[in-house]
Amino acid sequence: MERPPSRRARIAFALWVGVILIIVVPWYRWQGHTHWANVEWIPFSRPSYHVRDTVLNTLFYVPFGLLYRRMMPRHTLGAVVAAFLLSSATELTQVHSHGRFPSSTDVLSNSIGAWIGMRWYDARSDRATDAGPDLR
């Protein structure tokens, strides 16, 4: 039987989701109308695409994937699916902003970042298991 996630793991994950929401959702300059023309539907298709932004978006979701996997170790792709859903939701809020622009590049980068975090957690866990018991 699988152990439930520790309280510490759940709190760490919830805090990171909070950080994502605080940073990504446009809490100011909210408009009563949408800007669907500003949505980048096809990843990497805008001339304004910046490698730096993509790298930062990817790195921003690495802790999300790592903490999700720590909290739910048996859910293989759960971190990627959860990151995709959270990222899609936060990008969607930007449709109502004059200063932010929703981007499928961001959603893809965030999902890849979560996958990297999940794999990093797996690699760390495998090393700890391979090292054998702590005989101190």
Please place each PLM-identified region on the residue numbering.
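Bulky hydrophobic segments
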Residues: 1-136
